[in-house]
Amino acid sequence: MVAFRFVYIPLPFFFFFFFFFVFFSGVSQLQDQTATKKSVRILSKILIGDDGRVYACSDNDFFSFESNGSIAWSVHMNFKCNTDFAPVYSGFNQMLLLAENRILRVIFPRNGTKSEPELFFDPGETILGFAVSVSSSSVYITVKNHGLYAYNMFRQQLWIAEPKIERFGYRLGCRKDFDNCTFNSRPVIDSCEGSIYISNNEGELYSLSLRGTYYQWIQDFSLVDRFFTVTPGNNGLVYVVFPIKSLVFALDSFSGDILWQKTIGPLAETSASDPVIDSNSWASIGSLDGTLYSFSRTGDLYKIPKNAETDSVIQIEPLLDCSGYAVYVSQTKFEGMIDRVIEDYTYVSAKKPETAVFSLVVPETRSIYWSQSYSDQIPGLLLDEDLQHFVLDERIALAFVAASSSGNPFRCRSKHEKLSSSCSFAEPEHLDIYIGNERAIIWFLLFEFVIMVLFAALVRFCFIFWKKKKLQDRPFSTFLDKRRLLHRKSREIDKTITRLQNESTANESAVDKIGDLIQKRENVKRKLSSTYSLGRDIDESKSKLKDYVLPLYGGSSRSFSYRNRENESITIFQTPSDESSSEESYRDEHYDDVADDEHDEDDLDRKQKGKLLAHSEGSSNDGDGIASSRRSIYLKHIFDD
């Protein structure tokens, strides 16, 4: 495999003067070069906030710049800041930064009142880097030769993690040199997965949980190279870049499996090899061949532009715009570029830079929305004169271009909105489980639903059924025997009524018998639908009032009406009297009492038959007038068979 290494060979003292004259058009030339070096300060790496301001530190001061380069406010510190690390936003209008192996907390001014930076963490050892999780309000710090420390915002230690792990007698990390193995990189946080990624000096990459020292997976890259950079995609992927080998790996953030790998152009051996991931889940990285390489989640590669000029390089990492959909890229054209292959490395050399080109690119569509070239002067930047006190290289200039949204047609979004957009791409593709025939599963679920509904109905029926009065302290078999007896009686009464109706004679005795049988059948049906039903008990007093209707009496005459079996209607009107009413009421009550006796059904039939016979004889011996005075039957019944 052919690797690349960029070696920049400028003319003596030319590099400094080029950037000084290119980015300071309004500053006159100084006579003494030594005095010029003493008058300027070097800014640390840049952080662009959601408010559009640029945050950086220099020497013992922390600065907040407006997008035009003017200083919004500054805070003096007691320690000199480390320019290799950018400030980190920690929430609640606070910043954390590294200064002389100490982490300081800078609080934004309130109502014009500034507060001095406070010491957040001082291990007394070398700090390799730190990261902040705003969602969990925690800070994760890598201390050289010690491990990974987790602190909350109240400076309370949560836990400590080390690369040496032994579980059940097995080593999970540091397999080659267990004694001298240490973490040697700064931690990076995957906000979507809630994970921390950190590597050791043996080329192993760890994935830890934010909540504790739970190691999710360990991937060994020692066979590829021990020097690599890690960038969380916040989209279900982790990007591992090997600058010397010019390789890009995409790992599953859940399992650590390698999904794909690509070879790109030569990269600078600095942090400029870190890719930037936009909200469309495209990872972009600049190369020394002047090309912007963009990868989709599935590994599709776009080169922007397709045919890059051979005298251009991209030596600083692109910056994400405020919308999250585009990136700002800086290309530098050099005079006399030469590349040579020596053994496994490609060396690129150049004489002097000529032009810097800033562009706004959307990797997903390969569209260039804005581009501006600067040579000797940069009138288009319109930067404030406050920046004349600092060294303004193309890294700083690109940061202010991105902060001012130069040529950007997209709406700016907050960091939370951009993170939510990218996290939506983190689909659980690793859960590849065979679930069988979906159609069969749907039918099975439907069948289960029907069974559950039927079971619920059965439970409800049983709950209502066992609350019946006839089942309280009585055997269930007695209840069933009574139901069968009542059904048999109902059928016998129907047969008797049919036989009497089919007889040609319609005398008074037959009418009385039919009336009694109809009333008896109604009582049987009432019991089957209430006390001996399979449902809840019904209040019989209400049903009686609802079923019986008082007849209309217009004299002493009687009225009899018969119809055929298919559509039967019987209407009986007789003259009421006090004596007959009391006698009939007593007979009805006696009938109900005997009918409720569940232990002597034969006696019930015998009493009813004897009473019916005695009543029929009394009606035959008496005259029509006597019978009408002693009998009181108020019945109107209509039924259809």
Curated annotation (Swiss-Prot):
Its main location: membrane. It is found in: Cell membrane. The chain crosses the membrane at residues 441-461. Residues 584-593 have a biased composition (Basic and acidic residues). Keywords: Cell membrane, Membrane, Signal, Transmembrane, Transmembrane helix. GO terms for biological process: embryo development ending in seed dormancy; pollen tube guidance. Residues 1-29 form the signal peptide. Residues 594-603 have a biased composition (Acidic residues). InterPro entries: GEX3-like (IPR045301), Quinoprotein_ADH-like_sf (IPR011047), WD40/YVTN_repeat-like_dom_sf (IPR015943). Residues 570-627 are annotated as: Disordered. One of its GO terms (cellular component) is secretory vesicle. It is a single-pass membrane protein. Expressed in mature siliques and in pollen, mainly in the sperm cells. Detected in the egg cell within the female gametophyte. The keyword Mitochondrion does not apply. Required for micropylar pollen tube guidance. Plays a role during early embryo patterning. PANTHER family: PROTEIN GAMETE EXPRESSED 3. This is Protein GAMETE EXPRESSED 3. It comes from Arabidopsis thaliana (Mouse-ear cress). The gene is GEX3.
